[in-house]
A protein has these predicted regions:
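Extended helical coiled-coil dimerization/tether regions that scaffold
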Residues: 115, 122-145, 149-489, 519, ...
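Amphipathic alpha-helical scaffolding segments
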Residues: 2-14, 49-59, 178-189, 463-468, ...
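Acidic, metal/cofactor-coordinating or nucleic-acid-engaging core segments within structured domains
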Residues: 104, 108, 479, 506, ...
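Short polybasic amphipathic segments
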Residues: 28-43, 52-54, 210-213, 423-439, ...
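Switch/communication elements of ASCE P-loop NTPase nucleotide-binding domains
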Residues: 1-13, 422-575
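Long, solvent-exposed N-terminal ectodomains/accessory regions
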Residues: 40-60, 68-76, 80-84
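RecA-like P-loop NTPase motor core
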Residues: 87-96, 106, 141, 147-156, ...
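Conserved P-loop NTP-binding catalytic core
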Residues: 2-57, 90-91, 95-103, 109-111, ...
Length: 633
């Protein structure tokens, strides 16, 4: 909550500039001091009702101070809104926190509802409790809100200091959607690791990227078109546009203003349309559907998002029996497309994927995307890659291997198959010598992501969330003018959920391998915070780095046991405060067996007693019970 309030203070007033991010809420009434160290300096983040303050205690300086406007007895400070340059100076002295927790009982919205404040602008007048309150001020919401909800959304360009994972809506995780998102994260990570020749420890071992298999799903285009026409033309049951009509319409409009602008500015492959045979649909349908989708998406963006309000009247829509036509003035269309090129937000993500896919395909009917496709593509320069400010003409493999010089997973995420396609990620397995494992016929073993076990998927989901965000964060250039974090706090809450014990055992080593890879040419700092009940994880952590809790309180130091390289079975009992070393039901049966062998009255039959005695796994316990004889007395 303290970090949320801290972020609110320096982020307020930027809603229009970051349209993809949900606005943060400020939670008043919090009195807390958070202490941390960066390098050799000690810091204090202080929250006192409506005041948030960050101090360097070593230098005895105040780095950041802000209050809510005219709230309680707080005196408003002169500074209310901070630009990105000022935010950069603030976060230089703070850290970025990435939290993962897959427990269904965690982060439920209703448990985090509080009276909150929000930053109101002219569009928020209906949400203001007292209509007389000023706009562009902190205003009290009319009813309690869940302050935790906006932190799940990661569309702020990594400005805020905190993100929670996985995404929850009203406390619920959409498992199907999370699986889809995890596949995208895992794919972009594997591709980025394999495509760029940086020193690798293969923290995803034993897996390695093989390829993506893709197939156009024309029904997805029709569904999107139906929704589009319902929204903008109020047509509830539009007729399906036949594939032939779509391609013919595309061929007719290839050289219109809109078509030329899309091809020229996005640098799409130049199709020789006069040579296209109309019965050769398969070869060109990918291109036709993608360009048609780009047109629809551009129209929708200009009508829907405030960031594109200056282009709201640029495009005009015409709908007929067998066509949907979108057109506009050439100069205005060019301005729109140039604006799209410079927009890295989620708004244009689908367009980026469509354009990048068409450039990867090079005018062919692409069914498989391999490492070779990506390497060639980025060496030839992506239009969006250039637009992101990375204009170095030197091939990727010859560049210095630092965070400022290699591409982030976000770039590769933008090159995954567009929404019109069904696709699957295939992985190879590698041995300890990094050799790909083959089957009996000598063919590489290829494992589709959707056929992996739930434990394997859980491991990749948890790991990829942190790896994905970290690799994006460290790839932000110091020259970009954007706030850049150099200190990271990784929080793995209940990390062992659904994981196989062996995956728990190697988890710490995997994290270390990841951080070693990320630190190639960098100077970042990391704090790893794990909340766990797993002795498999505890065995890799020194005792002095562990905080033991019992009933919410830290236990006495004399009760702590050495953990590093400790026997995992022994730690299950000693480090997690278990009262017994065997199950409760087994204990009851053993007590009843002992009473029977002592000749006392029980409900246990002789046959059951013999069966239980033979089933005892501990040979010492079994031997001791066998020595018990009936008491003749």
């Amino acid at each position: 909550m303290a970090i949320n309030n801290f972020c609110y203070m320096f982020e307020r007033g930027h809603k229009r500039e970051r349209p993809g991010a949900d606005e943060l809420y400020y939670v008043p009434g919090l009195f807390l001091k958070l202490y941390f160290q960066l390098n050799k300096n000690s810091y204090e983040l202080k929250s006192r009702y409506a005041l948030v303050e960050l101090q360097d205690k070593t230098e005895n300086t105040t780095i950041f101070e802000a209050t809510l406007d005219n709230i309680g007895n707080e005196k408003p400070l002169a500074k209310q809104r901070f630009n990105d340059s000022e935010i950069s100076s603030i976060v230089d002295n703070f850290f970025y926190t990435i939290v993962s927790n897959y427990s269904m009982q965690s982060f439920v919205d209703d448990n985090y509802k509080r009276q909150i404040y929000f930053y109101a602008d002219k569009d928020d007048i209906n949400r203001i409790e007292q209509k007389k309150e000023f706009i562009d001020h902190d205003c009290k919401a009319a009813y309690p809100h869940s302050w935790i909800s906006p932190i799940f959304h990661k569309n702020d360009g990594y400005i805020r200091s905190l993100v929670l994972n996985p995404y929850r809506h009203n406390g619920n995780i959409n498992l199907s959607n999370e699986f889809k998102l995890s596949k995208e994260r895992v794919a972009s990570l594997f591709i980025s690791i394999d495509t760029i020749d940086i020193p690798k420890r293969y923290f995803f071992r034993p897996y390695k990227f093989s390829h993506l298999e893709i197939k156009l799903n024309a029904k997805k285009f029709q569904y999107y078109l139906d929704d589009f026409l319902r929204e903008f033309e109020n047509i509830n049951n539009p007729r399906p546009i036949p594939k032939e009509s779509l391609i013919l319409d595309f061929l007719r409009k290839t050289n219109d203003d809109f078509g030329l602008a899309i091809q020229n500015i996005f640098k799409l492959p130049n199709l020789q349309t006069e040579e296209i045979k109309l019965n050769d649909y398969e070869k060109f349908e990918n291109f036709c559907y993608c360009v048609a989708y780009i047109k629809l998406k551009l129209y929708k963006i200009t009508k829907k998002y405030d960031a594109y309000k200056d282009f709201k009247e640029v495009l005009n829509l015409h709908y007929g029996e067998n066509f949907v036509q979108i057109e506009g003035a050439a100069s205005q269309i060019n301005d729109l497309l140039q604006f799209v090129l410079k927009d890295p937000s989620h708004i244009t993500k689908k367009i980026r994927r469509l354009v990048n896919f068409l450039c990867l395909a090079k005018g062919t009917y692409l069914k498989k995307i391999t490492k070779k496709n990506f390497t060639q593509y980025f060496n030839e320069k992506s239009v969006f890659y250039n637009a992101d400010g990375k204009t170095d003409e030197e091939p990727i493999e010859h560049r210095p291997q630092t965070a400022d010089d290699y591409l982030s997973p976000q770039i590769y995420d933008d090159c995954l198959p567009p929404a019109l396609f069904d696709w699957e990620l295939y992985l190879n397995k590698i041995d300890k010598n990094e050799n790909i494992i083959t089957d009996e016929m000598g063919n590489p073993i290829e494992i589709p992501y959707n056929q992996m076990s739930s434990g394997e998927v859980q491991f990749l989901q948890t790991f990829s969330i942190h790896a994905y965000h970290l690799m994006n964060l460290v790839s932000i250039s110091n020259k970009s003018g954007r706030p850049k974090y150099n200190n990271f706090n990784l929080v793995f809450d209940e990390v062992e959920i659904c994981m196989h014990p062996e995956m728990q055992r190697v988890f710490i080593k995997k994290i270390i391998d990841l951080l070693v890879d990320l630190e190639t040419g960098n100077n970042n700092s990391y704090n790893i915070f794990i909340i766990t009940h797993s002795p498999f994880i505890l065995s890799d952590i020194p005792t002095e780095n562990i905080l033991y809790l019992e009933d919410g309180c830290a236990i006495e130091e004399k009760r702590r046991k050495p953990t590093f390289a400790q026997n995992i079975g022994d730690m299950m009992y000693s480090s997690f405060f278990m009262e017994k070393t065997i199950g409760e039901f087994a204990e009851e049966k053993l007590k009843e067996l002992i009473r029977k062998r002592q000749g006392k009255k029980t409900h246990m039959s002789d046959q059951e007693a013999d069966a239980i005695l033979k089933s005892i796994g501990d040979p010492v316990i079994r031997s001791l019970i066998e020595e018990i004889e009936a008491n003749d007395d």
